[in-house]
Amino acid sequence: MISGLSNVNIELTNRCNKSCWMCGRRKIEKDYPDLLQEGDMDFSLVELLAKEVPPRVVIQFHNNGEPLLYPRLGDALSLFRDQVKCLDTNGKLLVKRISEIIDNLDTITISVIEKDPEGDEQYEIVREFLSFKGDRKPIPIFRLLGDVPSERWAELGLIAFRTLHDPLGSFGYKKKVVLPEIGICLEVLHHLSINKDGLVSACVRFDPQGEGVIGDLNKETLEEIWNGRKRALFLSNHLNGLRGMTPLCNRCEYWGVPTG
């Protein structure tokens, strides 16, 4: 049984069609190109996940790539009938993939970044998408990263403010991070991330070295990984105030509560 899981990030692809100045991906591409082998998730793995992820779990179809680049996007989204379906996009392909998006997601988040030279173009694409979509799902959310004027975006939908941090990980935040009252990282308690190759991580933090990997769906079921020894060690360290004993967590400042 999978008990306590609330969110899963599924990386349909790690390919991207935008070069965001504050993205850690740029650093990896330049200094460690061998760590970033671009590609898409095999559709058979998507089919497997549709069967193994429990009902009513929130699925976010993104991680280190642009999900709208996935060739069989509409087919993939349609497989998950009993889960809450969301994704985060830069918006470039919203109009092109609109027939696969409308009524096939619950929410869609458009990331709007500080000092983006393509900002005005992005805004016009979003407006065109929304005019076609009308009142149908998905519900749009605009994730403003850094110092982004919010007025025009607020007219289009919900706003989620986010502060910037170091490109190489969840540290060096521009604002003080928010801690949960229970003092335990909510990501470790309730979250999983699955990359395009089927490697499962304990959270969705930027992790090019794979320090947070706790299982492989090519060898184990999602239930076995969730209840397995590696995740249990992550969880035990956090429950016992030993966050610093876990390699990925010892430099991370994020506690599962977004900072705006």
Each predicted region: which residue ranges?
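Conserved residues at the C-terminal ends of beta-strands
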Residues: 62, 111, 206
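Conserved AdoMet/S-adenosylmethionine-binding subsite of the radical SAM
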Residues: 70-183, 187
